[in-house]
């Protein structure tokens, strides 16, 4: 599920980026353009927004499973996972702000 969410996020993000304008005066109108004029643009935008939440739910379940089964005893693997979790959170924050 985690991989499926990640692939969905990447694909919908690419489709949204094709129609998005980052200029400060036209950013809002480009989002309105995506929702109104692009075929299934409203669906792509909603899948991208809700897919991010589902991705983090799956990620937290994965961490909880690791804690339940004692995977934290494998120090190197656990530390790499923590670094990846923090990088994912930072990336999501930057994506949300931008």
Swiss-Prot record:
This is Cytochrome b. Component of the ubiquinol-cytochrome c reductase complex (complex III or cytochrome b-c1 complex) that is part of the mitochondrial respiratory chain. The b-c1 complex mediates electron transfer from ubiquinol to cytochrome c. Contributes to the generation of a proton gradient across the mitochondrial membrane that is then used for ATP synthesis. One of its GO terms (molecular function) is ubiquinol-cytochrome-c reductase activity. It is a multi-pass membrane protein. Heme 1 (or BL or b562) is low-potential and absorbs at about 562 nm, and heme 2 (or BH or b566) is high-potential and absorbs at about 566 nm. The cytochrome bc1 complex contains 3 respiratory subunits (MT-CYB, CYC1 and UQCRFS1), 2 core proteins (UQCRC1 and UQCRC2) and probably 6 low-molecular weight proteins. Binds 2 heme b groups non-covalently. The gene is mt-cyb. The keyword Translocase does not apply. It comes from the Eukaryota. Heme b b566 binds at residue 62.
